[in-house]
Design a protein with these regions (language model features):
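Juxtamembrane interfacial secondary-structure elements that flank transmembrane helices
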Residues: 16-31, 80-94, 118-127, 156-166, ...
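Juxtamembrane helix-capping/reentrant segments at transmembrane boundaries
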Residues: 27-47, 93-107, 174-181, 242-249
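Hydrophobic transmembrane alpha-helices
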Residues: 1-16, 57-65, 130-251
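Hydrophobic alpha-helical transmembrane segments of polytopic
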Residues: 3, 7-10, 43-51, 71-78, ...
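N-terminal signal-anchor/initial transmembrane insertion module
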Residues: 1-63
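Hydrophobic alpha-helical transmembrane segments in multi-pass integral membrane proteins
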Residues: 59, 109-127, 191-199
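Hydrophobic alpha-helical segments and helix pairs
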Residues: 66-119
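Non-cytosolic membrane-interface motifs at loop->transmembrane helix junctions
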Residues: 95-101, 128-137
Length: 251
């Protein structure tokens, strides 16, 4: 009788346990089907939209006037350059980004354009004195505008050099060798920040200074991260000589 009960118990256990599986091991549930990935959009498309937004918003908000025209001209040239670089120069290492970034970036740049234009309309220091665009600018303002232009040209130069490193279509990071990169990892950001500093000095706009400060903080963060990546990747390469993120000997 005991033998029959033992055989019956074994048969029941064998029916519920797969061969080779321990009795104490629970069965795993079947894998769930993969969820649909969040919508994504090409980097180039996002850049085109986020640079087009301030080009449209600033002139729409800016009032007619010599000083407002000066501020609008510098603003328009800067973002027109960015847009042209996006279309014809930049080589993106990544293909897509989340679609939500499109609305976030366009809102940021479009909102900044509206705020800076409104602030310059409200408190432009030369609005009542200037009769013609550039005609009666002070020497100090002319120096600021000239320095702004130099930073814009140097920023373009660094972007052209970076694009030349991927002329073969590769997305692999390579060591930049142009003179601005000898001691600084991200001189393109350095000149970008410089152009906004001189724009803020020329316009004397608190809103422009706020936009400059926020942008500089973000670019400094990106530069530090990039320097760490490059130091790991190119630590044994003699061609890599950058020691700082943005400013030689300082940051």
């Amino acid at each position: 009788m005991a033998l029959r009960l033992l055989v019956a118990a074994f048969a029941v256990a064998h029916a519920f346990v797969s061969p080779g599986r321990a009795l104490s091991t629970p069965r795993r549930p079947p894998p769930r089907p993969a969820t649909t990935m969040a919508a994504r959009i090409p980097w180039r498309t996002v850049f085109v939209c986020e640079y087009t937004a301030p080009l449209l918003v600033f002139p729409a908000v800016s009032k007619a006037g010599p000083f407002s025209t000066l501020a609008s001209t510098l603003w328009t040239v800067h973002f027109a350059k960015r847009l042209a670089e996006t279309l014809f120069v930049h080589k993106f290492s990544k293909g897509t980004m989340p679609l939500t970034n499109l609305f976030k970036n366009c809102g940021y740049y479009g909102g900044a354009a509206a705020l800076v234009a409104w602030d310059i309309n409200r408190s432009g220091p030369y609005g009542a004195q200037l009769a013609k665009l550039f005609a009666q600018l002070s020497t100090k303002t002319k120096v600021f505008v000239g320095a702004w232009a130099i930073c814009e040209v140097l920023n373009l130069y660094t972007h052209l050099h970076l694009a030349s490193l991927r002329s073969d279509g590769s997305r692999e990071a390579k060591i930049p060798t142009a003179w601005p990169f000898r001691r600084v990892c991200s001189p393109n950001y350095s000149f970008e920040i410089g152009s906004w500093i001189f724009y803020s000095l020329a316009t004397r706009s608190p809103a422009a200074w706020a936009f400059t400060t926020l942008g500089a903080w973000q670019m400094a963060t990106w530069s530090k991260q990039k320097l760490k990546r490059y130091k790991r990747k190119f630590k044994d390469e003699e061609a890599f000589t950058a020691t700082h993120a943005l400013v030689p000997g300082v940051f």
